[in-house]
């Protein structure tokens, strides 16, 4: 691939001139709407095509969480579109993550918020971060999410540098269970799988989060062609503008496993620099260079094979999430003897310490 030779079909997810007003997304009663999604100060729901145009008001359930019942403890994440706060329920003492997104932003981000709300509302899987409730009020969307007190794998890697084989197997077995649910049960491509979107907790659980750039296909074999997500973990077929499917997430998974095994991002910057100075040079490296692999030495052949199976340039040569669950790397260990909860705690995860709760969530 020559420098600057990206496909003319490449679609960058950037704001466009003349974006539509926020009023397009609001009803006269102040309900946030997008397609079949409705959110207001009382909650969220997905309407069916059979429901009439004039809808009955969204009514809060008796056991529903309310924003007024939550006390803010600390800001644990910031982004261009909002913040994530650690909050505590006044009556039960339970902690939650409250993601607050202001809607005075461009239409592309509003559409991404709507997509995340739809997936959160309709997904039930123990390997995805739980979304308990969503609200729209005073110009902001608020999502009450499960609080993962160990932070992200990106945070964890800063402490441990690299993760041993047996723990890697236990961690990514859980991640794959989440991907099987997304890919095969829901026909969803995550499109932004990376260490900061894999969260851990004191129970040793690992869960996938952040569905803002995910897309829903009509079936498991569906293809998409939109250029969104984090470039570092993007598959070659997505970078060049080709259509892509669930296997693009498998490429991202392979890069994440490789990074967790070595403690380093798989694509080394040129000239021994610390970081890539140009995202386009990085994307060219992903497309032009051979797939990265584990260095020879201190790694099991099963782990090396697992990563190689994920990092195939041709997506048709990659295994699916279901097929990867049968890989020897995920079946060589006795998981009853692998205590991820103790490993996360002993290895330096910032578990349950309110003075050290930064970087846990992204917006």
From Swiss-Prot:
Phosphorylation at Thr-220 and Thr-226 by MAP kinase kinase kinases positively regulates kinase activity. Phosphorylated by MEKK1 in response to cold. Phosphorylated by MAPKKK5. Pfam families: Pkinase. ATP binds at residues 76-84, 99. One of its GO terms (molecular function) is protein serine kinase activity. PROSITE patterns: PROTEIN_KINASE_ATP, PROTEIN_KINASE_DOM, PROTEIN_KINASE_ST. The modification Phosphothreonine is found at residues 220, 226, 230. Gene3D superfamilies: Phosphorylase Kinase, domain 1, Transferase(Phosphotransferase) domain 1. It catalyses: L-seryl-[protein] + ATP = O-phospho-L-seryl-[protein] + ADP + H(+); L-threonyl-[protein] + ATP = O-phospho-L-threonyl-[protein] + ADP + H(+); L-tyrosyl-[protein] + ATP = O-phospho-L-tyrosyl-[protein] + ADP + H(+). GO terms for biological process: auxin transport; cold acclimation; defense response to other organism; innate immune response; pollen-pistil interaction; response to cold; response to salt stress; xylem and phloem pattern formation. GO terms for cellular component: cytoplasm; plasma membrane. Activated in response to cold and salt stresses through serine and threonine phosphorylation by MEKK1. SUPFAM superfamilies: Protein kinase-like (PK-like). The active site is at residue 192. Coiled coil: none annotated. SMART domains: S_TKc. InterPro entries: Kinase-like_dom_sf, Prot_kinase_dom, Protein_kinase_ATP_BS, Ser/Thr_kinase_AS. The modification Phosphoserine is found at residue 56. Disruption phenotype: No obvious developmental defects under normal growth conditions. Simultaneous knockdown of MKK1 and MKK2 results in dwarf and small plants exhibiting a seedling-lethality phenotype. CDD domains: PKc_MAPKK (cd06605). Residues 70-330 form the Protein kinase domain. MEKK1, MKK1/MKK2 and MPK4 function in a signaling pathway that modulates the expression of genes responding to biotic and abiotic stresses and also plays an important role in pathogen defense by negatively regulating innate immunity. Plays a role in abiotic stress tolerance and plant disease resistance through activation of MPK4 and MPK6 by phosphorylation. Acts redundantly with MKK1. Belongs to the protein kinase superfamily. STE Ser/Thr protein kinase family. MAP kinase kinase subfamily. Interacts with MEKK1, MPK4 and MPK6. May form a ternary complex composed of MEKK1 and MKK1/MKK2 and MPK4. Interacts with MPK10 and MPK11. Interacts with MAPKKK5 mainly in the cytosol. This is Mitogen-activated protein kinase kinase 2. It comes from Arabidopsis thaliana. The gene is MKK2.
């Amino acid at each position: 691939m020559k420098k600057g030779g990206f496909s003319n079909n490449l679609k960058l997810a950037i704001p466009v001139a003349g974006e539509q007003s926020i009023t397009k997304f609001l009803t006269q009663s102040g309900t946030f709407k997008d397609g079949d999604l409705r959110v207001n100060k009382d909650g969220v729901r997905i309407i069916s095509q059979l429901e009439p145009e004039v809808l009955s008001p969204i009514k809060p359930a008796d056991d529903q969480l309310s924003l007024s019942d939550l006390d803010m403890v600390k800001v644990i994440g910031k982004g261009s579109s909002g913040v994530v706060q650690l909050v505590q329920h006044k009556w039960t003492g339970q902690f939650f993550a409250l993601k607050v997104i202001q809607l005075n932003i461009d239409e592309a981000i509003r559409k991404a918020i709507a997509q995340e709300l739809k997936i959160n509302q309709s997904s039930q899987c123990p390997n995805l971060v739980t979304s308990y409730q969503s609200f729209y009020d005073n110009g902001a969307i608020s999502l009450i999410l499960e609080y993962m007190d160990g932070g992200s794998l990106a945070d964890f890697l800063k402490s441990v540098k690299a993760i041993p084989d047996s723990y890697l197997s236990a961690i990514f077995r859980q991640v794959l269970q989440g991907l099987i649910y997304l890919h095969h049960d829901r026909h969803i491509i995550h499109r932004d799988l990376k260490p900061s979107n894999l969260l851990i907790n004191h129970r040793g659980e690992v869960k996938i989060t952040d569905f803002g750039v995910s897309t829903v296909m009509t079936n498991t074999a569906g293809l998409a062609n939109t250029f969104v997500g984090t470039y570092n973990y993007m598959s070659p077929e997505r970078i060049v503008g080709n259509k892509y499917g669930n296997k693009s997430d498998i490429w991202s998974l392979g890069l994440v496993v490789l990074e967790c095994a070595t403690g380093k991002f798989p694509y080394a910057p040129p000239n021994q620099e610390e970081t890539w100075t140009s995202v386009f040079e990085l994307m060219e490296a992903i497309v032009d260079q051979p797939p990265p692999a584990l260095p020879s030495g201190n790694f099991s052949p099963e782990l090396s094979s697992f990563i190689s199976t994920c990092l195939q340039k041709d997506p048709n040569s990659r295994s699916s999430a279901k097929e990867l669950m049968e890989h020897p790397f995920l079946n060589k260990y006795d998981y009853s003897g692998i205590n991820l909860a103790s490993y996360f705690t002993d290895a330096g995860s910032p578990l349950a310490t309110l003075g050290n709760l930064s970087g846990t969530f992204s917006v």
